[in-house]
C-alpha cells in the first residue's frame, strides 16, 4: 500500500457528548488534488481509506479522531476480529497553528467568540471562507448535500492552512 497525504474532514450530528452518527466525510489527496466525498452509507469505506495514510485535519486530534473511534464503537459489528483502521500519522493544523504562534491574532472582522486558531479565522486570514452552513436550527440533524459541500469547503480551507503553516516553518 502506498502512503498518501490525505486532507480530511467529517460532519456529525453533534459534539462528541451528543454525537450518534457521522453524516459525511471528504478526503483530498494533498499531492494529486483528487477529492473523494463520502455520504452516510459510505462512512465505513471512508474510515478504512485512512488506514496507513498520513491524515491532515483541523482539530483532527481534538474532535474528528475521537468521533471516528466513537462511530466505530457504535458500529463494532463492522470490525469483528480486527482493530479499527488507523492512520500512519496525523498532522493537526489546529495544533500546528497553536505551536507555531500561540499568540496569533484573530482577524478583526470576526466576533470575539471565534478563536484565532480556528478554521474560520484561518479562512478569513487566507481569503478562503468556510461557508455559512450550520448556523440554522437543525442543520446537523440529517445529512444533506449542502452539508457535504460545507465539508468539502472545510477540506479546501484546511489544505490552504496546511500550506500556510508549512510556509511559516520554512520562513522561520
List each model region and its residues.
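Entry/capping segment at the start of metal-dependent catalytic domains
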Residues: 1-24
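A general structural motif
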Residues: 2-3, 51-54
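RNA/tRNA-interacting regions in translation and RNA-turnover enzymes
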Residues: 6-7, 48, 158
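Active-site-proximal helix-loop-helix substrate-binding element of RNase H-like nuclease domains
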Residues: 16, 27, 33-40, 54-171
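Short amphipathic alpha-helix with an adjacent loop that forms part of the alpha/beta core around
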Residues: 43-49
Amino acid at each position: 500500500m502506498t502512503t498518501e497525504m490525505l486532507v480530511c474532514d467529517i460532519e456529525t450530528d453533534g459534539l462528541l457528548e451528543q454525537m450518534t452518527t457521522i453524516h459525511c466525510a471528504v478526503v483530498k489527496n494533498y499531492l494529486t488534488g483528487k477529492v473523494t466525498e463520502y455520504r452516510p452509507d459510505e462512512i465505513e469505506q471512508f474510515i478504512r481509506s485512512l488506514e496507513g495514510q498520513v491524515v491532515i485535519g483541523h482539530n483532527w486530534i481534538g474532535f474528528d479522531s475521537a468521533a471516528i473511534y466513537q462511530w466505530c464503537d457504535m458500529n463494532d459489528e463492522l470490525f469483528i476480529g480486527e482493530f479499527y483502521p488507523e492512520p500512519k500519522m496525523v498532522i493537526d493544523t489546529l495544533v500546528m497553528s497553536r505551536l507555531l504562534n500561540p499568540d496569533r491574532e484573530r482577524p478583526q472582522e470576526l466576533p470575539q467568540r471565534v478563536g484565532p486558531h480556528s478554521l474560520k479565522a484561518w479562512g478569513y486570514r487566507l481569503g478562503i471562507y468556510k461557508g455559512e452552513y450550520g448556523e440554522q436550527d437543525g442543520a446537523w440533524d440529517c445529512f444533506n448535500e449542502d452539508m457535504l459541500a460545507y465539508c468539502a469547503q472545510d477540506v479546501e480551507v484546511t489544505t490552504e492552512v496546511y500550506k500556510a503553516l508549512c510556509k511559516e516553518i520554512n520562513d522561520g
